[in-house]
Regions:
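Juxtamembrane intracellular "pre-TM" segments in multi-pass secondary transporters
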Residues: 1-17, 202-206
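Helix-to-loop junctions at the C-terminal end of transmembrane segments
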Residues: 64-76
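C-terminal transmembrane helical hairpin of 12-TM major facilitator-type secondary transporters
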Residues: 77-123
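Multi-pass alpha-helical transporter architecture, strongest
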Residues: 175-206
Length: 206
């Protein structure tokens, strides 16, 4: 019912999870949509080769989702996500410096997508620990936030490319979102680990 969604949205943690997932899954979707054009425009690759490069990135990110969940089980979802945002932000910011080698850019994008894929798994390792009874509602809201994040990133990168003739600013803004997510997670880390994520409440690593 609509009331369940409104009640869930009244909890500040739901907004944090929606933001964290909009960066990981939204970033994954946005890059998957943007990379074919990026490799073509930036390096003059033909559409088929650009498609292969993009497929390698998407495959890497998809493969890492379950592995990211397993890693989060082992070391904790918060620690996993902090690593994810660090790696993704560094790689995407580095690509923004107009690398001369398409292979170097591909390598950095693969690492970024591996990180974002792992982040998708890590977010959903944490969600059931925080929202026991509202898991269905929260899964829907967080998934929606990921989709909206992907749309906004794709549209934003495209608009910035069109207005500046370059992907640099868009990539750096996306990297800065990763930095923002890192600081946001670092800010709630202590509260989460001493309330619903404490050893007295859950056996899972948070």
């Amino acid at each position: 019912a609509m009331g369940d969604y409104l009640k869930a949205l009244g909890d500040r943690d739901s907004w944090w999870f929606m933001f964290f997932y909009s960066v990981t899954f939204g970033g994954f979707l946005g890059l998957a949509s943007t990379l074919p054009g990026y490799f073509h425009d930036q390096y003059g690759l033909n559409p088929v080769t650009a498609g292969y490069y993009t497929a390698a990135c998407v495959f890497a990110g998809s493969l890492m989702r379950p592995l990211g969940g397993a890693l989060a089980d082992r070391i904790g979802g918060i620690r996993s996500l902090l690593m994810v945002y660090t790696l993704a932000a560094i790689c995407i910011a580095a690509v923004g410096f107009h690398l001369t080698s398409a292979m170097a850019a591909l390598g950095l994008f693969v690492v970024a997508m591996l990180s974002l894929g792992a982040g998708n798994g890590a977010v959903f390792q944490l969600v059931p620990q925080r929202f026991h009874k509202e898991i269905g509602v929260m899964t829907g809201l967080i998934g929606m936030a990921g989709g909206i994040g992907g749309f906004c990133l794709t549209a934003g990168l495209g608009a910035i490319k069109q207005s500046t003739g370059d992907y640099q600013l868009g990539l750096w803004l996306f990297a800065s979102l990763g930095v923002l997510a890192w600081f946001g997670l670092h800010g709630v880390k202590r509260r989460w680990r001493t309330t619903w994520g404490s050893a007295a409440v859950t056996a899972a690593r948070v």
